């Protein structure tokens, strides 16, 4: 995909959070480290998303050569950064079920996440997991517009 013009690489490890930290450390982490080491020459951002319920695994990821670590909605942006020793950018972490709520509720949740994210450099807004099939494309479009407008406003306030 990168050769065809992809702008980033993301490894989704959606259910690794089901493992204990020890099993993750023994059976999965060496493979993740090898994958990202072998991709180190790629000239695009490399993202690792350890999936749902993976907050306890975050301290194990501080030496993975990913540029960004994705967070699910169960760990705040601030706590995720702390567990990663502020060594890497983070991405996330809107609960995808919020997309079933009215637009103003979606925007409240998105604003709270953005407010945490922009406290330090190295943040990408995203969902904390994948979309559900019933997700409304209109709500996603409105959310995207809100993210752009709100983020720009907040960044301008900081300067």
Where are the model-predicted features located?
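Active-site loop segments of alpha/beta catalytic cores
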Residues: 1-159
